C-alpha cells in the first residue's frame, strides 16, 4: 500500500495509438456487440502490471459493482474484456472467475467513499463482497482460472465475481 510502484495504467486507449486501434478492432468489437446485442463504448481501459515474484493480486470483486458505485453505471449491460499480454499460466497470476456468479448481484460491504479509486488500486478493502457471499458463490459455482497464450481474449459479464491472482513466477 505504501509503494510508489505503478500497478495500473488507466485510459490506455487514449494514451497510445496501438491501444486505440485495438479498442476499435472489429475482431474485438464485433464479439462485444454480439454479446450486448448492439452498440458499445469503452467505459474503462487499463493495463495491470504484475511483475514476477512481486505482482500482487486484487481481491474478489464485480466490475459492475465498482462501476455502479464509483461511476454511476445504471445497469448490468456491459462486458469486461481481458487481453492477455504475456503467456498466462496458473503460476503467473491469471484472472480467477466464479462462473455463474453474474446471475446474482452481490453488493459490496458498506458504502464506497468518493475518490475511492485512488486507494483501491493500492489495497482493496472497500468495494468487495463479504466472505459469506463469496463462500456461497464459490461453493455453488467453483473457481475457474483461464490460461492461454499472449493475445488471447477473455470476455465475461461485468457482474462476474473475479480477482487476479498473484504472479508467483
Regions found by a protein language model. Name each.
Residues 1-71:
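Non-heme Fe(II)-dependent double-stranded beta-helix
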Residues 1-2, 151, 164-169:
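Short, intrinsically disordered, charge-balanced linker/junction segments flanking boundaries
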Residues 35, 68-90, 147-150, 155:
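Short, conserved beta-strand element in jelly-roll/cupin
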Residues 47-54, 64-65, 84-90, 100-104:
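Short acidic/polar capping segments at secondary-structure boundaries
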Residues 55-62, 69-71, 91-97, 106-110, ...:
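A short secondary-structure junction signal
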Residues 81, 156, 162-168:
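Short beta-strand His + acidic residue motifs that chelate non-heme Fe in jelly-roll/DSBH
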Residues 88-161:
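Double-stranded beta-helix
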